[in-house]
Amino acid sequence: MHDPHSDRMSAGETRAAASLALVFAFRMLGMFMVLPVLATYGTDLAGATPALIGLAIGAYGLTQAALQIPFGVISDRIGRLPVIYFGLLVFAAGAALAANADSIWGVIAGRVLQGAGAISAAVMALLSDLTREQHRTKAMAMIGMSIGLSFAVAMVVGPLLTRAFGLSGLFWATAGMALLGMLIVAVAVPRASRSLQHRESGVARQALLPTLRNGELLRLNLGIGVLHAILMASFVALPLALVDEGGLAKEEHWWVYLSALLIGFFGMVPFIIYGEKKRRMKRVLCGAVL
């Protein structure tokens, strides 16, 4: 038995946070690896146009956004694990569909199906079930770090895998990562000793519409939406610009992304330290946007 008021995470909490962070990392790694390569390698697909390639890149977000809340509600009723298993299986099926596609429409269909495996809400809810309230922020920070790391790794590994195995091989690797995530859930994620119904979950369902209309949240959601739109648009335009304007072969794009990530990471550290010490993170954020 662990002390419910302990300042340290218990072994079970650490295991839960680490294993769920790993599940998130493998899923997001598979999702992110496609971004830097689809615009260039996707031109070989039948019917491919810049607009349809852009749709293929961002299509997963449509179904993911639509199903995130329903999957979370379903996980409250039938349990977190069945929803997570199902979501990862759907994600793997979408990757397999895209891997076997000969046309851009097949890839779009696969990406839409991938997005339908919207397990983020269920994973975060399971994390809440397995951690005490005072340690929840640390556990969620571990998941946030895993997502950031998976993005950085994907920018390098995605182009390298595609160069070696083609776009089809990349999607098969993505499917394998989803299945590996299912294995991690089966063998590493602790089981909750009892079904926990968080009071805040019930309140959130009752106040769903007022929450969606909240002005502060609307501004936050709009800002995040614009940020993601710019990111997706960048991966439509930048790879093609590197080929057409920069004369850089698509097989060599990985080192451009690696260099940009390293410069961005080490360049931001002093500003983050400054913002934390001077309590001017808003100013730092605005400067980063500019």
Question: What spans do the regions from the language model cover?
Answer:
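Juxtamembrane intracellular "pre-TM" segments in multi-pass secondary transporters
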Residues: 2-14, 190-223
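Short amphipathic helix-loop junctions that connect adjacent transmembrane helices
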Residues: 36-50, 236-252
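Residue-level signature of mid-helix packing/kink "hotspots" within the transmembrane helices
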Residues: 61-69, 151-152, 261-269
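Conserved MFS/SLC helix-loop-helix module at the cytosolic interface between two early adjacent transmembrane helices
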Residues: 66-102
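Helix-to-loop junctions at the C-terminal end of transmembrane segments
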Residues: 68-78, 266-280
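Cytoplasmic membrane-interface "Motif A"-like loop-to-helix N-cap segments
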Residues: 77-87, 276-289
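Cytoplasmic helix-loop-helix junction between adjacent transmembrane helices
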Residues: 109-148
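C-terminal membrane-cytosol helix-exit motif in multi-pass small-molecule transporters
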Residues: 176-195
